[in-house]
């Protein structure tokens, strides 16, 4: 094997380690880096929390009450979802500075940046946000009305290019939920209620973002919310205690699973379980991420999914905005007990959490085997290597960003786009259970 004459000496030891060698197999690089990581570094990698572009030494007004430097340098966190963002050009410059700070840490593990949708007209933190400089497209429900896989895949390809231009490598979407409860507030983030349509468009969406597979030019999709967030009891919000239950009066739990198998076949490597409790569907009425029958038995074993399972945001500890932890069904457990239960269920990463200390303490206290952390960290490292972040996490000038916008690849409502007649009335389909979730 040829030895590179130049390399990124990420651990600053003056020699080429296997994990720094781009010519070695990914699995070999993963194992080498894993062997060099401390317990604290492993626990930090399992956090996936919010960050606001800006100064690294200022506590932001919204999000975790801790500086970016503290999270990256001292807590060893290297997965972040961006909240508010300046223009695309400013975001790209900030991203490179963030990667430079990560490069200077002990092992130089690069940052993975994720985001909720950035291409719609709404501006709702935690659901979808506009970003100046990106092209504008319909919400997923609008794509559902168009019903064209080619249009959705084209959108995904354009959005992929725009995400790459500013450093976003994980899309916290698509939503593969079936909106069978018309009062549910997240309907606009879905492709609709009809499983066949949602299945086709979800797979097309993933193909657009990931291409032939997640690599240096792909954006990894985190499909959500397994096993389907649509049957929300009374349409209430599962972020809150009063909306923690999912109901299936039509006994259609299996119907809501239909889009996920094809999503995995399309290459989705990350999954986010839903907040809610699937009432009466498993032996224990607890939230999805705490439910071993949902995560291990259904997702891991039945579907054979071996990718990353990242919880929805704030299921273990609450945030400073006054929202309690969404630990539905296990509210009585301590923080450490909640971590143990989710790990036993089979999750890999914790959305919205920025305190890795309880995980490390569980190992120190003899209540958790470090090998269990290794299992999840392997998955997280593997994806970073596949995306090429260890070889070059930085991005170049974004002066060509407008070339990716609608003028080059026009959305279907622009005059230059081909027209497609859509029937003014769409009869209900027998396969859709509608509100009978």
Question: Residues of each region from the PLM?
Answer:
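Alpha-helix termination/capping residues and helix-transition junctions
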Residues: 69-77, 165, 265, 302-303, ...
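Second-shell residues forming the walls of enzyme active-site clefts
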Residues: 38, 94-107, 122, 129, ...
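N-terminal hydrophobic targeting/anchoring segments and the immediately downstream early-domain regions
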Residues: 1-145, 153, 159, 164, ...
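Active-site-proximal beta-strand/loop segments in catalytic clefts of secreted hydrolases
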Residues: 46-52, 81-86, 115-118, 173-177, ...
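Preference for extracellular/luminal or secreted protein segments
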Residues: 1-68, 301, 317-437
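Flexible hinge/switch segments at interdomain interfaces of large molecular machines
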Residues: 128-134, 173-180, 227-236, 390-402, ...
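Glycine-rich tight-turn/loop motif centered on a GG-T
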Residues: 81-85, 131-150, 182-201, 235-254, ...
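Short, acidic/polar
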Residues: 58-73, 151-159, 250-262, 332-339
């Amino acid at each position: 094997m040829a030895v590179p004459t130049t390399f990124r000496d990420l651990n600053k030891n003056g020699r080429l380690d296997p994990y720094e060698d781009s010519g070695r197999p990914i699995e070999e690089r993963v194992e080498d880096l894993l062997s060099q990581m401390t317990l604290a570094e492993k626990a930090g990698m399992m956090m996936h929390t919010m960050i606001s572009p800006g100064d690294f030494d200022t506590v932001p007004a919204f999000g975790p009450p801790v500086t970016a430097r503290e999270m990256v340098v001292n807590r060893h966190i290297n997965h972040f979802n961006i909240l508010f963002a300046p223009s695309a050009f400013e975001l790209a410059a900030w991203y490179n500075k963030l990667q430079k700070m990560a490069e200077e840490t002990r092992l130089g593990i690069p940052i993975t940046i994720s985001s909720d949708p950035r291409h719609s007209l709404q501006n709702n933190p935690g659901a979808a946000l506009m970003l100046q400089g990106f092209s504008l497209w319909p919400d997923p429900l609008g794509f559902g009305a168009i019903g064209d896989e080619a249009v959705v895949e084209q959108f995904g390809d354009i959005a992929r290019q725009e995400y790459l231009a500013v450093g976003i490598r994980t899309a916290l979407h698509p939503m593969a939920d079936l909106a069978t409860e018309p009062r549910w507030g997240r309907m606009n983030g879905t492709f609709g209620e009809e499983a066949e349509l949602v299945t086709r468009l979800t797979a097309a969406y993933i193909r657009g973002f990931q291409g032939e597979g997640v690599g240096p030019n792909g954006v990894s999709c985190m499909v959500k919310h397994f096993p389907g967030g649509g049957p929300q009891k009374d349409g209430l919000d599962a972020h809150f205690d009063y909306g923690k239950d999912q109901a299936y009066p039509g006994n259609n739990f299996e119907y809501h699973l239909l889009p996920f198998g094809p999503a995995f076949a399309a290459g989705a490597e990350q999954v986010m379980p839903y907040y809610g409790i699937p009432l009466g569907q498993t032996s224990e009425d607890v939230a999805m991420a705490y439910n071993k029958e949902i995560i291990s038995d259904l997702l891991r074993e039945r579907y054979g999914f071996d990718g990353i399972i990242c919880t929805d945001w704030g299921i273990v500890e609450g945030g400073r905005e006054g929202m309690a932890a969404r630990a539905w069904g296990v509210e009585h457990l301590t923080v450490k007990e909640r971590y143990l239960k989710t790990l036993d269920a089979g999750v890999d990463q914790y959305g919205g959490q920025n305190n890795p200390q309880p995980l490390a303490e569980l190992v120190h206290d003899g209540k958790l085997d470090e090998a269990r952390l290794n299992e999840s960290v392997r998955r997280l490292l593997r994806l970073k290597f596949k995306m090429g972040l260890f070889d070059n996490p930085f991005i170049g000038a974004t002066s060509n960003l407008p070339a990716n916008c609608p003028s080059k690849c026009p959305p279907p409502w622009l005059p230059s786009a081909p027209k497609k007649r859509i029937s003014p009335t769409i009869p209900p389909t027998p396969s859709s259970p509608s509100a009978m979730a």
